[in-house]
């Protein structure tokens, strides 16, 4: 009963970090596309 609790707590920050990573990749892709097209 004690093991699932820390696992759930560790999953939440991993999801947030994953979303931040995707956001950074999206922003970098937009910046590079603007740089190359301009």
Curated annotation (Swiss-Prot):
The keyword Cell cycle is annotated on this UniProt entry: no
BP GO annotations: photosynthesis
Membrane topology category: Single-pass membrane protein
Entry's transmembrane regions: 17-37
Claim: Translocase is one of the keywords in the record: no
Stretch forming the signal peptide: none
Subunit note: PSII is composed of 1 copy each of membrane proteins PsbA, PsbB, PsbC, PsbD, PsbE, PsbF, PsbH, PsbI, PsbJ, PsbK, PsbL, PsbM, PsbT, PsbX, PsbY, PsbZ, Psb30/Ycf12, at least 3 peripheral proteins of the oxygen-evolving complex and a large number of cofactors. It forms dimeric complexes.
UniProt subcellular location: Plastid, Chloroplast thylakoid membrane
Function: One of the components of the core complex of photosystem II (PSII). PSII is a light-driven water:plastoquinone oxidoreductase that uses light energy to abstract electrons from H(2)O, generating O(2) and a proton gradient subsequently used for ATP formation. It consists of a core antenna complex that captures photons, and an electron transfer chain that converts photonic excitation into a charge separation. This subunit is found at the monomer-monomer interface and is required for correct PSII assembly and/or dimerization.
Pfam families per the UniProt record, alphabetical: PsbL
GO cellular component term, pick one: photosystem II reaction center
Family affiliation: Belongs to the PsbL family.
Protein name as annotated: Photosystem II reaction center protein L
SUPFAM superfamilies: Photosystem II reaction center protein L, PsbL
Gene that produces this protein: psbL
Main location (coarse class): plastid
Keywords: Chloroplast, Membrane, Photosynthesis, Photosystem II, Plastid, Reaction center, Thylakoid, Transmembrane, Transmembrane helix
UniProt cross-references to HAMAP family, sorted A to Z: PSII_PsbL (MF_01317)
């Amino acid at each position: 009963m004690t093991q699932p609790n820390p696992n759930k707590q560790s999953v939440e920050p991993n999801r947030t970090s994953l979303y931040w990573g995707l956001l950074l990749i999206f922003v970098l892709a937009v910046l590079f596309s603007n740089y190359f097209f301009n």
